[in-house]
Amino acid sequence: WGLGFFRDCRFVERLINLDKAISCTYHGQDLRTRGVLKPLNDLSKLNITSELDLFSKHPNLDYMFLPYDTKQFSFDIKINDPIRICHAPTNRYYKGSETIIPICKRLAKEKEIEFILIENKSFNEAQEIKKSCDILIDQVHNRGGWGYGMNSVEALSMGLCCVTELIPEYIDFIPDNPFINVDSKSLFDVLSELVTNKEKIIEYKQKGYEWVEQYHNYNNTSNVLYKYYEDLGWL
């Protein structure tokens, strides 16, 4: 979060005096709303983020995909009957839920699918519900960061087909991404076509599971992190 134990960074300065290396990791809202703490920013030799939009807010960032244990779930490519679509907002405004929820409710009536809104549940409850679904709608509008985050990483690891809004910059950054790209205007039509094409859902389930394993598995992300350390002479 780009923070030490104290705002004046006295603890970090003590570590520097002990010849310790300092690295900062920015997760999104920290840099978007607060910015950097200058004393700590001056001392940090490595600044890492998994949020692509932060690159416009800091001149010295390195990227690392969100680390995750992608093997903790058993991958099941089967599709429910009826198809189950879920949306799991931690913050409705940031996820564009006011757009997503009415569209999914309409779809449930017209296409005979199930829509599950995952809110106000314990972590374990939310995970179990999400695992039982076929499609996750992550976000539209990109109000709280671009594209996708841990919500989608979890869902891809579970073998879900993931739908979200990716801006052109993100598509250029991850051109082999497994997401079905939508915006507020196209969401209903895209979902309407998707739920009538089970082969396409299966295709994206498989593609997503392979992609999240390649980029987000913690063994792969740790290799990226250690390469940054090696480049700085820390290993």
Feature roles, as predicted:
Residues 199-230:
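A charged, aromatic-enriched C-terminal amphipathic alpha-helix characteristic of glycosyltransferases
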Residues 155-164:
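Short hydrophobic beta-strand element within catalytic cores of glycosyltransferases
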Residues 23, 29-31, 42-76:
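Donor nucleotide-sugar binding/catalytic pocket of nucleotide-sugar-dependent glycosyltransferases
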Residues 75-95, 101:
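Conserved donor-binding/catalytic core segment of Leloir-type glycosyltransferases
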Residues 101-122:
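A conserved nucleotide-sugar
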Residues 139-149, 164-178:
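Nucleotide-sugar-dependent
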Residues 118-129, 143-148, 153:
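Conserved active-site histidine-acidic residue motif and adjacent donor-binding/catalytic loop
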